[in-house]
Design a protein with these regions (language model features):
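Signature of N6-adenine DNA methyltransferases within the class I
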Residues: 21, 59-62, 84-86, 98-108, ...
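Preference for the N-terminal adenyl/adenosyl cofactor-binding alpha/beta module
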Residues: 1-18, 132, 137-370, 400-410, ...
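Flexible phosphate/Mg2+-sensing switch loops adjacent to catalytic phosphate-binding sites
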Residues: 44-49, 209-213, 329-347, 369-399, ...
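A short, conserved, highly charged catalytic patch centered on acidic carboxylates
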Residues: 1-105, 119-123, 147-148, 152-157, ...
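Polybasic, glycine- and aromatic-enriched phosphate-binding surface used to engage nucleic acids
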Residues: 79, 96, 506, 593-858, ...
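Conserved residues in the N-terminal Rossmann fold of short-chain dehydrogenase/reductase
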Residues: 108, 398, 403, 442, ...
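Glycine- and acidic
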Residues: 12-20, 76-78, 151-158, 173-180, ...
Length: 961
């Protein structure tokens, strides 16, 4: 097979040599067709690829990509002899917009060379380059092109090199601290060694200088003296007059101001020698820092397992907030004066990351701004009056970048990352700037709390034009346990405008909104921010504290509503990029709203398997506005809570036992069989959806005190044996810093024989009903089911105290479904039914007639009949059944839902094409006004005017005997 492949590829090389002169416009398509044939296809069309595919521009109009083969590759052709490095930005822009099912790889080709990119893992340099003449023997990097693709083999895959290099320095650091070297000295020594390793491979030190020095460190004393002397010389503005270190230049007085001297063991010297064997010019500073930082204290985790934020995810902030507005201005500049003004602006353009970690956002922001600066110079060169030797001496400096973080070591890493960024930009862009001395960034990076100053007031932030970053992902319920009550009191005192139940990151959003300058006609580049937050920033208190305020003073121009985040395990995030203005002249008319979709199935692998890809796909639509829910739909975020929905209570979370021993399999019933009044059937959420029933029973003492509970000796002894020790242990382990048992642990211990949350109020309501409604609390699509009144629901279920078919119809309709999706909170990627935001604000029909009520009832009964008939012949339960709704084509289930939706619209008085959210929001507002006036309104359930409401309750239910 390999020989056959080689023959086809050799024939392609010979054909190109004989027939192609390298004309991009005239020969690209025939070249690409032959290229596909060389890899075993019948041609690019037969493989499913498209030439000249339309790609939307950032503003108006379209570009045309030379070839797109989803989900495999985008190919951009350039004329023979063209410098492919100049076309990276164009290729990345095309790739970004080719959603959904975006190609995994990108190829830039000038008929003689193939530059291969994998932007998911490595952005600014190719993962490999293959010359045309090498193709028969070096097709490994292009192995994804074959009809039966194999894993490509890349020669410049910098992520793996970076992880391996980081691993060596992590082991060095752990070895030093493990044997008692002061932690601060060990950190400083490691960072200074890191700079030396980079320096000898990127031309700041003589090649192999540090490696040869390590060869001579044959004793701990020599290691102390030789390496220490190198660091001392790197801090000296005066070169050594002679000797071994006379070639060492001055680096700066920041990183090396305190040269670290350590007597290294032979094993530690070996770690450094192994590290020196890597080509550090291929180590990526923007991911090295994060990997290194996250590995330092994780004894069970080496660098290869650490998470980092992928550069392509960082560009989802840096691109819209920094690159796009600058790129538009640069390309639209029409005079030399325009370009000179842009140059002056960009050289004074300042960026802040107030939760910078090891500096990866700032590194990529700096790199992209240097590219923009280079593009300004390139365009200035188009004017004959410009003498390149007379260019101004000013340039974008790393001193324009500011960072804050509570972790001192992360700040030191960030400084090193930014120091390296300058030299790497010089090499990448071939610009004439002095690499040394490195900028001293001590004044730019601050160690400490970014939110609170020592006196409890808001921390002062540096004055900048733009703010970027990803603040800590910490949910509201974890703030007190993780940060302490005292800290949270001071934080809420300093930020009274942020609600108490807002996630931690919301404080950064609100602080950024208040700190940013206004975006104006003269300062169009300022007043911009892009932050990553928990996906909950779109919802409830978090939304009120952050995005509501942002939308009140500015405009969200690009957002991602929900995606997995590459930087943390099992975290789903939302991203908002905004401008602090509502002036139509300063914001784009078309805003970009990205949203997660189900991965499109294909015979080809759509995404990489690395952690940065996390198996998801995004799509994008251009919209006229993005609201504080990060949606372009009617904004229901400000809907009012309706008192008629709250009192009396209609909806509850199911029972939370709090310990597995309270839930009994059928086989364990015998141990307490003589005390049946404490036991009831118990239902968990998965049983409803999967159709698989594992009979469980709940042991529940209810509200009985300990003396009453002892009247049931078997059950009491069982709980005393199985539950009490666990609650005693939890109380002990959960003490606060003052040694006090936390309130919830104290409550559980004081009533250890009772369920954690027995929901007595819910059980009282359900005891009056023959059946009740439930749906899963965490669900993409609420599927409502009646449950027999004898069964007690578990905490994975949202419970609704309705037994009638009319209420079922309203809740199962598209009206409630759309309201749910607009108002729910989220757990990871799945929506969560939050009664306070969804049910308590949902307006029920006010003028339903007996005829429209009956129509809803009959349609709801019919829907359940269709479901029941289908389930009799389908494995997998309701979950499997409802997956068929997403498939194309007609089905009885779709028809039944359409019938129900039409009936519910008529009950509301909505037209068939009326926007449901708009109609419901208007009704919500009218009901709030009516309630405030003291008028009688129709709350949840059967309309009060309906005669003989008992006729609206059928008998089918889950668990019915």
């Amino acid at each position: 097979m390999t020989d056959q492949r080689r023959v086809l590829l050799q024939q392609f090389v010979l054909w190109v040599d004989a027939h192609i002169i390298g004309d991009e416009k005239g020969e690209a398509q025939v070249f690409l067709d032959k290229f596909f044939r060389a890899f075993g296809h019948e041609g690019f069309k037969e493989a499913g690829a498209t030439c000249e595919m339309r790609v939307k521009k950032a503003d108006k109009g379209v570009n045309f990509a030379d070839l797109v083969w989803k989900p495999v590759v985008l190919v951009e052709m350039k004329k023979r002899g063209e410098d492919l490095s100049k076309h990276y930005s164009q290729a990345f822009m095309y790739w970004t917009r080719l959603v959904p099912n975006r190609p995994h790889y990108v190829i830039l080709c000038n008929f003689d060379e193939f530059w291969i990119y994998d932007f998911n893992s490595q952005m600014d340099s190719p993962v490999d380059k293959v010359k045309l003449v090498e193709l028969p023997d070096r097709f490994g990097p292009l192995a994804f092109m074959f009809p039966q693709p194999t894993e490509p083999v890349f020669g410049n895959h910098q992520e793996s090199v970076t992880r391996q290099a980081a691993d060596r320095l992590v082991m060095l650091f752990r070895s030093m601290t493990g044997r008692g070297v002061d932690r601060e000295i060990a950190q400083r020594f490691t960072l200074q060694s890191l700079m030396a390793l980079f320096a000898e491979d990127i031309g700041l030190l003589e090649k192999y200088f540090f490696a040869r020095l390590l060869d001579d460190c044959v004793t701990p004393e020599l290691a102390h003296d030789l390496i220490g002397q190198l660091f001392l010389q790197m801090d000296s503005a005066s070169r050594a007059s002679g000797g071994r270190f006379k070639s060492v230049p001055y680096f700066n007085g920041g990183l090396f101001s305190m040269p670290a001297r350590v007597e290294l063991t032979s094993e530690e010297v070996e770690h450094l020698k192994e590290a020196a064997k890597f080509d550090w010019s291929k180590v990526r500073p923007e991911i090295f820092g994060a990997i290194f930082e996250h590995s330092m204290d994780a004894d069970d985790r080496r660098a290869h397992g650490a998470h980092y934020t992928s550069p392509v995810d960082i560009m989802k902030v840096v691109g819209p907030t920094i690159v796009d507005p600058w790129h538009e201005r640069i390309e639209k500049a029409r005079t030399l004066r325009d370009l000179e003004n842009l140059l002056l602006k960009i050289e004074n353009f300042k960026v802040l990351d107030p939760a910078c970690g090891s500096g990866n956002f700032l590194y990529i922001a700096y790199r992209e701004i240097k590219k923009l600066e280079a593009r300004i110079y390139e365009r200035m060169g188009d004017y004959k009056s410009i003498d390149s030797s007379q260019r101004p001496m000013g340039f974008v400096s790393t001193r324009n970048f500011f960072g804050m973080d509570i972790n001192p070591f992360a700040i030191e890493l960030a400084k090193v990352t930014m120091m390296l960024a300058h030299k790497l930009a010089i090499d990448e862009l071939h610009i004439q700037e002095q690499a040394l001395p490195l900028d001293n960034l001590d004044a730019n990076f601050t160690v400490g709390d970014a939110l609170l100053a020592e006196d409890g007031t808001q921390r002062q932030w540096p004055l900048v034009e733009v703010i970027v970053g990803n603040p800590p992902f910490l949910g509201a319920k974890l703030l007190k346990p993780k940060l302490g009550s005292d800290y949270m009191k001071r934080l809420r005192s300093a930020y009274p405008e942020v609600p108490g139940m807002a996630d931690f990151c919301v404080y950064w959003f609100r602080r950024a909104e208040g700190h940013l300058p206004l975006c104006t006609t003269d300062s169009w580049e300022a007043g911009r921010a892009g932050l990553v937050g928990t996906q909950n920033i779109r919802n409830n208190a978090s939304r009120v504290g952050g995005l509501d305020a942002i939308c009140a003073s500015g405009t969200i121009v690009e957002a991602i509503d929900n995606q997995p985040w590459s930087g943390e395990a099992n975290v789903h995030v939302s991203i908002a990029n905004w401008v602090k203005t509502q002036d139509d002249i300063l914001v784009p008319k078309a805003r970009k709203l990205w949203f997660k979709i189900a991965s499109i199935s294909s015979g080809r692998k759509a995404r990489g398997s690395g952690h940065a890809s996390k198996e998801f796909d995004l799509d994008m639509r251009e919209v006229s506005h993005i609201n504080a829910s990060l949606s372009d739909k009617v904004d229901v975020g400000a809907a009012f809570t309706l008192e008629c929905n709250v009192t009396p209570s209609f909806t509850f979370q199911g029972i939370t036992p709090g310990h597995a021993a309270f839930v009994l399999p059928k086989g364990e019933l015998s141990s307490i069989s003589a005390e049946p009044e404490l036991v009831s059937s118990y239902l968990v959420g998965d049983e409803i959806l999967s159709g698989v029933s594992n009979r469980r029973f709940l042991l529940n003492f209810g509200q009985r005190d300990v003396l009453e509970a002892r009247r049931f000796p078997k059950a009491f002894a069982y709980v005393q044996k199985n539950v009490l020790p666990a609650r005693q242990k939890a109380a002990e382990e959960g003490k606060d810093d003052q040694g006090k048992v936390r309130p919830h642990h104290r409550r559980f211990l004081e009533r250890w024989w009772q369920l954690s949350w027995g929901r007595a109020d819910m059980l009282e309501q359900l005891s009056k009903l023959p059946r009740y409604l439930v749906c899963s609390r965490v669900t993409k699509r609420p599927i409502f089911t009646f449950v027999h009144g004898s069964i007690h629901p578990g905490d994975a279920l949202q419970v609704f105290a309705f037994s009638d078919d009319y209420s079922f119809g309203i809740l199962q309709s598209s009206a409630h479904y759309e309201w749910f999706h607009a108002k729910c909170s989220n757990m990871k990627s799945d929506p969560r039914y939050t009664s306070e935001s969804v049910f308590d604000t949902f307006p029920w029909p006010q003028d339903a007639t007996p005829e429209t009520v009956n129509a809803v009832v009959l349609a709801g009964i019919h829907l359940r009949q269709v479901r029941s008939l289908a389930l009799a012949h389908l494995d997998g339960g309701l979950r499997a059944l409802y997956k068929t709704v997403d498939l194309p084509g007609k089905s009885p289930l779709k028809d039944a839902h359409a019938e129900l939706d039409a009936a519910v619209r008529r009950a509301y008085g909505f037209g068939p094409r009326q926007d449901l959210l708009e109609g419901l929001l208007n009704l919500n507002s009218k009901l709030k006004d009516a309630i405030d006036r003291g008028d009688v309104v129709q709350g949840p359930g059967i309309p009060a005017s309906y005669k003989e409401p008992e006729r609206l309750t059928s008998t089918d239910s889950f668990g019915q005997v």
